[in-house]
UniProtKB/Swiss-Prot annotation:
Record note on quaternary structure: Homotetramer.
Organism this protein belongs to: Influenza A virus (strain A/Shearwater/Australia/1972 H6N5)
Post-translational modification, as annotated: N-glycosylated.
Family to which this protein belongs: Belongs to the glycosyl hydrolase 34 family.
Xref: InterPro entries: Glyco_hydro_34, Sialidase_Influenza_A/B, Sialidase_sf
Record text on activity regulation: Inhibited by the neuraminidase inhibitors zanamivir (Relenza) and oseltamivir (Tamiflu). These drugs interfere with the release of progeny virus from infected cells and are effective against all influenza strains. Resistance to neuraminidase inhibitors is quite rare.
Keyword Transmembrane found: yes
Alphabetical keyword list: Calcium, Disulfide bond, Glycoprotein, Glycosidase, Host cell membrane, Host membrane, Hydrolase, Membrane, Metal-binding, Signal-anchor, Transmembrane, Transmembrane helix, Virion
Stretch list, region Hypervariable stalk region: 36-80
Required cofactor(s): Ca(2+)
HAMAP family for the chain: INFV_NRAM
Protein name per Swiss-Prot or TrEMBL: Neuraminidase
Length: 468
């Protein structure tokens, strides 16, 4: 039998089986119908039929994501750690605001300062409600006006109109972070009835009224927060005579305590404060008598010590030559009167010694250097162990002030001391300009010695607006 015949035979057999199967099904159905129609009686079924069924059980695994996201409640900054011992100060940032402002949308500002929270540092500044190289920048040499406001940008950014965040209306200010939220304080109003508005987390929370009716003012640098309580210093009274000075304490933007400082014959303004081992230490400005700087130290109960930086090296401006100066821990040293007006500055205690900044010029706000004066915190020492120039005497400087980086940001066991330096441009020194503004540099303490240089402002004046 050939293959084709085999296929035909198999196919025929298969077809026959299919037909036979169909006939069996038809016969089965026919017999079922006949049996139903022949017997209409109801029969009770007493039989039990057992069905043995095998059930297949399958395990189905469904992956479930059990990750639970919790909102972590921020903690208050501790800030009770000691201040780090440092061997020098390294450049950290430079905003170049005036240079950029010749063509960019940069605010006219003064009194810039820096403050840090647990995750970021910000540059704060007092605007004049005007942009550089614009007609509204005219006569912005004036300190107090209704157009001034405290604003902030990330550290290192210029005070530009696109990143700036509004903090408070004011022509005098301070700001700090308690670990949970920013607190900003702006002083505004008439000279004889100014008041401060406290903002906490961007919300106005309290007000401080002028108590002497003579230009209420505050630090122009960072306040200090320790374990959820924030501290700052305010002045009310004459700039060239005995005034009134108070320490304030707040919790979540609400004033909870205040204390007036007894300091007869002394003058305190524009304090630069920092935390150190649970206390607040401030190096301030005497605008009345002293070319040495006032020192104020207080604890959480506002118990305070007040005096002057002992060092036999003067750090205010204007001042006499170092060789002609004798320091004092208790009294102002210098000539009284408005000619000894001073400038905001800073210092950091390092054991018995002190790091202090000052202008290089003894008579004007130009140049800047940082000195380590051995035993300068406790006695009238003239020993300068380190001196670093950060701005040469050919360039205008201005205010300077303190801030610190908390351990929450650095993971160190000590608080890093830092300072900022303002470089004022325009009036009053550069009379071809119709405006006054500033840029700033920032330096932080490091464990190694670093060389100096001159990180000057660098803007070329006059601007176009000055030529109109």
């Amino acid at each position: 039998m050939n293959p084709n015949q085999k296929i035909i035979t198999i196919g025929s057999a298969s077809l026959g089986l299919v037909i036979f199967n169909i006939l069996l099904h038809v016969a089965s159905i026919t017999l079922g119908i006949i049996s139903v129609t022949k017997d209409n009686k109801v029969h009770i079924c007493n039989t039990t039929e057992v069905y043995n069924e095998t059930v297949r059980v399958e395990t189905v695994v469904i992956p479930v994501n059990n990750t639970i996201y919790l909102n972590h409640e921020p903690e208050f900054l501790n800030n009770t750690e000691p201040l780090c011992d440092v061997s020098g100060f390294a450049i950290v940032s430079k905003d170049n605001g005036i240079r950029i402002g010749s063509r960019g949308h940069i605010f006219v500002i003064r009194e810039p300062f820096v403050s840090c929270g647990p995750s970021e540092c910000r540059t704060f500044f007092l605007t004049q409600g005007a942009l550089l190289n614009d007609k509204h920048s005219n006569n912005t040499v004036k300190d107090r006006s209704p157009y001034r406001a405290l604003m902030s940008v990330p550290l290192g950014s210029s005070p530009n109109a696109y990143q700036a965040k509004f903090e408070s209306v004011g022509w005098s200010a301070t700001a700090c972070h308690d670990g949970k939220k920013w607190m900003a304080i702006g002083v505004s109003g008439a000279d004889d009835d100014a008041y401060a508005v406290i903002h906490y987390g961007g919300v106005p929370t309290d007000v401080i009224r002028s108590w002497r009716k003579q230009i209420l003012r505050t630090q122009e640098s960072s306040c200090v927060c320790i374990k959820g309580e924030c501290y700052w210093v305010m002045t009310d009274g004459p700039a060239n005579n005995q005034a009134s000075y108070k320490i304030f304490k707040s919790q979540k933007g609400m004033v909870v305590d205040e204390k007036e400082i007894s300091f007869q014959g002394g003058h305190i303004e524009e304090c630069s404060c920092y935390p150190n081992m649970g206390k607040v230490e401030c190096v301030c400005r005497d605008n009345w008598n002293g070319m040495n700087r006032p020192i104020l130290i207080f604890d959480e109960k506002l118990e305070y010590e007040v005096g002057y930086l002992c060092a036999g090296i003067p750090t205010d401006t204007p001042r006499v030559q170092d060789s002609s100066f004798t320091g004092s821990c208790t009294n102002a040293v210098g000539r009284s009167g408005t000619n000894n007006y001073g400038v905001k500055g800073f210092g950091f205690r390092q054991g018995n010694s002190v790091w202090a900044g000052r202008t290089i010029s003894v008579s004007s706000r130009s140049g800047f250097e940082v000195l380590l004066i051995e035993d300068g915190w406790i006695r009238p020492s003239k020993t300068i162990s380190k001196k670093v120039e950060v701005l040469n005497n050919k360039n205008w400087s201005g205010y300077s002030g303190a801030f610190t980086i908390p351990t929450a940001m650095t993971s160190k066991n000590c608080i890093v001391p830092c300072f900022w330096l303002e470089m004022i441009r325009g009036k009053p020194e550069e009379r071809t300009s119709i405006w006054t503004s500033s840029s700033s540099t920032v330096f932080c303490g490091v464990s190694s010695e670093v060389p100096g240089w001159s990180w000057d402002d660098g803007a070329i004046l006059p601007f176009d607006i000055d030529k109109m």
